[in-house]
Amino acid sequence: MAFLSLSSGDVTGFKVLFALLILYGLVSYLVHSVIHMKFIAPLGVNAPLDRFSEARAIEHVRVLAEQIGGRQEGSPGLRQAAVYIRTQLEQIKERAGSNIRIEIEETVVNGSFNMMFLGQSISLTYRNHTNILMRISSVDSQDSDPSVLLNGHFDTPPGSPGAASLLELARLTIDSGWTPPRPIIFLFNGAEELFMLYYGLQDDGLGSHGFMTTNRWRDTIGAFINVEASGTGGFDLVCQSGPGSWPSYTYSQSAVYPMATSAAQDVFGAIPGDTDYRMFANDYGDIPGLDIIFLLGGYFYHTSSDTVERLLPGSMQARGDNLFSLMKAFASSTKLLTAQQRESFGAAASGSKGESPVFFDYFAQFLVCRYLGLLLKKASPGVSQYSICDISPYASFIVLEKWEFILYL
């Protein structure tokens, strides 16, 4: 009988291979846990009122998706959803303290605009679209103060995590006892996906166009967060940011569960789809902001299988915690400016538009955020130790051997 004979080199090779397999398994498990939000415990309906609760947000989803059902433009369900959202906002207003001013508006918008789709220019005209707004501010604030906009649309097919997240977030803004240093505007727009229903992936953004062309607060918006969903949950990815570097930097400093990569912004440009981000940041506002989107489970997106039960546990909890922290960071920032102020200050208002932000998260634990611009200069003699240090909120440097690399944010 012949026996397999292994040399010492073969044994070492097998050990290395076995170690690599274990490492691969651990990394795969970690990545799967992060993508599916396994490390986040969603809070229930009885959670403290000063915390965002996924269970409370899902209650809104069930009303919108199951009790009301289809909410396509022109359907009775869309009007029922508007009534429900307005009712919830009025209830939130009743609980506000004496130091808070709340204004609720329901507006009907009309308009027209051109858009590019698959290389072709298309003209769209719309009438009688409903937008619902809630503006939360301190009693001593002015109408002209720069504000933060959070946008979500409620005209989706079954499932509406965007609008539901904002309802719970509006409640949290009041019940947390926080007094916003700058006004916060929640926009529930009722016409974002009309064009997509007929032509595939492209979204048209009629409601956001109506806001940007007619609303009295449009020129006060200093930053915005657009909440979207192209799936049933998972990591809440920042797929677009800008103009300038300020939005991505603010996200890197404030997100509780940072989930972002600058590569997503490059890929998104190649997809025949769009969001309300275009109306705010590019076509009509030039407003600094973020486009945040659910991606996992995209094969259920806009199908009959896009149900409440398919929402991944922990996804909306992570979204709510991130949005509340990010909203407070934007509202407290000195870079929050009105349209007139941005025009006066130019590129310095939110970071140069020529800057190219490069960022990525590390398993949703922290975000590495840097901006292109490299200066190389000679270090002092005798410096040989490798070190990484922060010298300002906008720069970091690496000292390696006798060369000092300064990477400007």
Named regions from a protein language model:
Residues 5-44:
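Hydrophobic alpha-helical transmembrane signal-anchor segments
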Residues 42-371:
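Soluble extramembrane regions of membrane proteins in the secretory/endomembrane system
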Residues 9-15, 361-384:
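Juxtamembrane/start-of-transmembrane alpha-helix segments at the extracytoplasmic/lumenal side
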Residues 2, 14, 19, 190, ...:
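Short amphipathic alpha-helical "recognition" segments used for binding
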Residues 12, 77, 398-399:
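Alpha-helix capping and helix-coil boundary motifs
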Residues 1-6, 353-365, 392-395:
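Membrane-proximal N-terminal segments immediately preceding the first transmembrane helix
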Residues 2-4, 21-30, 381-409:
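Alpha-helical transmembrane segments of integral membrane proteins
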